């Protein structure tokens, strides 16, 4: 049997980014299903009825539009650029993940699927998928690396509470990449009634495009909101990057505005120059994994290296193909933030703004802390808070040596 990482079929230019990123590198057993998903997405994405159904759920269920919040205390404390926070943490389920899940679940419904499966790292995508499955009366199974089930026990219980079955994945490094492998294997073995709700802007086409499409609501809103508040574009948009869904959603509406600097913040872990990092764009090389050509952390033989971050949502050994292309073309800049810097930012934003933000988002906040003082007071940064930090409080306390009862 062919493995899921074996190149059995390539796409044409469809699903390609930059010179050669993206594509479809998957076993033929999944090609027919991918073609169905691609057709459904292309047929429905601009369909007025589908758009109305999607918008109704985003507004009346997910609590959109999310706030664009002026972080006055941070702005004054850092003494430079004006800082606005795009509050995806205020969405139903507490993160940006629900934007994409609603869209994909509606596609699944139109395709007649009865069962949703998904991978999850920090658990937020799993929670969002379980939530929408409950709403739509669909079965749901979530695959999560055992390392992540151990450090995100609250989200595991939350998924089970919502009616999902959670599978701890014990193969490989037992983290997000292994959860993706397990979910792909499950989809290949049972695609007749099952839809794979991929949570990040990764995987074979059309998933990166589809995830970007459903997450672009973040930047579509922020552009309109800043126009209403300041009557101008931001100078910089900052978002954390694992696989890259919240970042591509945060960048989407600005990619064609060259005056707007786009900054993706990766997890440097213990340091970009150590072997305990997940800074894929800075450290990775071109390869093929999880059905796409992109940048990956890999050895000379093309075997995927283990990656590390304090953040379960950022320790993916690759990055979405559009991010790889944006980096290659110089349209976006990607920087690394260490565990220590992210933990400091977790405390900083809590004390400055009264917001407990996800440790993933705090990587972006840590970069804002560095860059804002170097910018003029009439410049504007939009930083996306991809999620809330309730899930991280116990692990951050432990990291700091504080004993708390989870």
UniProtKB/Swiss-Prot annotation:
PROSITE patterns: TRP_SYNTHASE_BETA. GO terms for cellular component: cytoplasm. It is an enzyme of class 4 (lyase). Its EC number is 4.2.1.20. The modification N6-(pyridoxal phosphate)lysine is found at residue 97. Tetramer of two alpha and two beta chains. This is Tryptophan synthase beta chain.
């Amino acid at each position: 049997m062919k493995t899921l990482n074996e190149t059995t079929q390539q796409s044409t230019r469809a699903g390609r980014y930059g010179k050669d990123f993206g594509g479809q590198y998957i076993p033929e057993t999944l090609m027919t299903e991918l073609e169905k998903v691609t057709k459904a997405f292309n047929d429905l994405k601009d369909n007025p009825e589908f758009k109305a159904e999607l918008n109704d759920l985003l507004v009346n269920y997910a609590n959109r539009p999310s706030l664009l919040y002026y972080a006055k205390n941070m702005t004054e404390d850092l003494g430079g650029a004006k800082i606005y926070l795009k509050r995806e943490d205020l969405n139903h389920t507490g993160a940006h993940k629900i934007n994409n899940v609603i869209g994909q679940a509606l596609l699944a419904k139109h395709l007649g699927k009865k069962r949703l499966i998904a991978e999850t790292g920090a658990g937020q995508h799993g929670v969002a998928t379980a939530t929408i499955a409950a709403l739509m009366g669909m079965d749901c199974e979530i695959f999560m690396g055992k390392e992540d089930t151990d450090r995100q026990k609250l989200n595991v219980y939350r998924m089970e509470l919502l009616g999902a079955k959670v599978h701890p994945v014990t193969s490989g490094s037992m983290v997000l990449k292994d959860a993706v492998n397990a979910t792909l294997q499950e989809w290949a073995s049972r695609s007749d009634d099952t839809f794979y709700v991929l949570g990040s802007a990764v995987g074979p086409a059309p998933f990166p495009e589809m995830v970007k499409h459903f997450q672009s609501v973040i930047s579509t809103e922020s552009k309109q909101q800043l126009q209403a508040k300041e009557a101008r574009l931001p100078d910089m948009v900052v978002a954390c990057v694992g696989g890259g869904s919240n970042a591509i959603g945060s960048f989407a509406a600005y990619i064609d505005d060259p005056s707007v600097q786009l900054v993706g913040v990766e997890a440097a872990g213990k340091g970009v120059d150590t072997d305990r990092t997940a800074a894929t764009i800075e450290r990775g090389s071109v390869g093929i994994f999880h059905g796409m050509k992109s940048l990956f952390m890999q050895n000379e033989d093309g075997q995927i290296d283990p990656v590390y971050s304090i953040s379960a949502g950022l320790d993916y050994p690759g990055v979405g193909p559009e991010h790889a292309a944006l980096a290659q073309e110089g349209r976006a800049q990607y920087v690394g933030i260490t565990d220590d810097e992210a933990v400091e930012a977790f405390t900083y934003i809590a004390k400055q703004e009264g917001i407990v933000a996800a440790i993933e988002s705090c990587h972006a906040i840590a970069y804002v802390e560095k860059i804002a003082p170097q910018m003029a007071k009439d410049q504007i940064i939009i930083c996306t808070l991809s999620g809330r930090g309730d899930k991280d409080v116990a692990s951050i306390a432990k990291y700091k040596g504080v004993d708390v009862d989870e």
